[in-house]
Amino acid sequence: MKVAVLGAKGRMGTEAVAAINAASDLTLSAALDLGDSLDKLTQTGTEIVVDFTHPDSVMKNLEFAINNDIHVVVGTTGFDDKKLTQLKTLLSNHPKVGALIAPNFGLGAVLMMQFSQTAAKYFESAEIVEMHHAHKV
């Protein structure tokens, strides 16, 4: 499968590019970042886009991909209910295109969710504070 990464120079994008390059059944079709043209997705025959960009640009990226029948995986944080509603509307016109929204690919975020489920069984109330690296957008 031909997979492109948007936000390829960021922390998670860099990891995604490395994982795709290491997989025998995947081909990196494009590694795009801020300022790069999305046209490269169609020019390279991309089948799946993994988006690790920014909440302000993710919908434009998804619209381009879905309108070009490219499946999408979104790892961008800040994907709220409004964006989810927009995505559902967009996908309703493209029934053969799939989308996966997983805004927390980081191990720490996954562990935090697991810890919170466990803690909820034992505490009446608790607060969990999530922190990011210093350069997180």
Please give the residue ranges for each predicted region.
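Extreme N-terminal starter segment of soluble prokaryotic enzymes
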Residues: 1-3
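N-terminal Rossmann NAD(P)H-binding glycine-rich loop of SDR-like oxidoreductase domains
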Residues: 6-9, 13-17
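NAD(P)-binding Rossmann-fold cofactor-contacting core
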Residues: 19-40
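Hydrophobic beta-strand scaffold residues
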Residues: 28, 72-73, 98-101
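Rossmann-fold NAD(P) dinucleotide-binding segment
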Residues: 48, 56-75, 84
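Rossmann-fold NAD(P)-binding glycine/threonine-rich loop
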Residues: 63, 76-99, 114-118
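Conserved anion/nucleotide-ligand pocket segment
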Residues: 111-137
